Amino acid sequence: MRLIPLTTAEQVGKWAARHIVNRINAFKPTADRPFVLGLPTGGTPMTTYKALVEMHKAGQVSFKHVVTFNMDEYVGLPKEHPESYYSFMHRNFFDHVDIPAENINLLNGNAPDIDAECRQYEEKIRSYGKIHLFMGGVGNDGHIAFNEPASSLASRTRIKTLTHDTRVANSRFFDNDVNQVPKYALTVGVGTLLDAEEVMIMVLGSQKALALQAAVEGCVNHMWTISCLQLHPKAIMVCDEPSTMELKVKTLRYFNELEAENIKGL
């Protein structure tokens, strides 16, 4: 596992965007051989999406031959709702870059057959071989995507019941009214994430410090689903300074020394 220790959320967003752009450009995608990118929603990736849009407008990257798969979507929320992840992604990213509509894959939380929707999503991912880079965030309780604590580390795309804590955290997007937050969501599984060639998780804020500690210094544990990344051959945690407050000093020093060259120029 790599840990990229930065200072601010803006630096995290810029580093993550730069890494994505470097991966896409090194891959040299074509229509027949697209780069497959997994994407999250929420507050954490906002600085990354902003930086990606800026880099696209500056001519540093094209998304014409990039295929995307989003992590999750609420169940029962109309896709036109401003807080659906369909709306979020178009508002904050897709509408500002040159990605073709047919290359965008989002779970349908209003599908008449939820189980079939989840199976088809997994099948479509497999049809591309694999996701080359899956970007994500982490919840205060260590969940990735909507894989809440005690999720199977072998799980695939499915419907999940959201914990009260997750709904409270997400209520900030729903006028701070937890009753407006859907109780269920479709989400890729932990196993789906682990199948990706590379997984990059961004960690922001002191409220995520225990989750980061569990991911880096703890044991692999389904109560902290983020800890599954210890099993991944190419996992990256990109974090700001407040999120590292629970890490041991020697742990942080170790990763600062390892990544000194990779965090320059931000």
UniProtKB/Swiss-Prot annotation:
Domain of life: Bacteria
Keywords: Allosteric enzyme, Carbohydrate metabolism, Disulfide bond, Hydrolase
Site positions for Part of the allosteric site: 151, 158, 160-161, 254
Catalytic activity of the protein: alpha-D-glucosamine 6-phosphate + H2O = beta-D-fructose 6-phosphate + NH4(+)
Membrane-spanning intervals of the chain: none
Active site: 72 (proton acceptor), 141 (for ring-opening step), 143 (proton acceptor), 148 (for ring-opening step)
Function statement: Catalyzes the reversible isomerization-deamination of glucosamine 6-phosphate (GlcN6P) to form fructose 6-phosphate (Fru6P) and ammonium ion.
Protein name: Glucosamine-6-phosphate deaminase
Protein species of origin: Shigella flexneri
Designated gene of the protein: nagB
